[in-house]
Amino acid sequence: MVQLITVEIATNSSGAFSTTFPVNGGRLMQYRYVPDGTAPLATGADIDVVGATTGFAYINQDNIGTTAFSKLPRQATSDEAGAASLYAGSGEPVEDAAVIGGEQLTVSIAEGGDTKVGTLYLWIG
């Protein structure tokens, strides 16, 4: 089952925003940022989504711009010994969706501009 989490972003006068919320667990499958039609986050805004307990960075996107976008984030995988898993033909890393182990997530915005707004959608399944 896929869960849709909606985060309404509203920066303060210094361009910052932060909120923390629980997640039951799953994988971060996709995210989408939609700017407000009249007061979008600044072009140089940074979005971070981090595990509140582990500090694991699920999203770290800088200078997001002022148009809507969607991403399907993936993390590099490794074998049981910790060596990078690579595709044999190309040597490119094998990637997979990051697992969220039932911890709280913190969404932070930096450099967002004075009292700017937008919406971040997270699909976790």
Predicted ranges, named:
Residues 1-125:
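Surface-exposed, low-hydrophobicity beta-strand/loop segments enriched in small/polar/acidic residues
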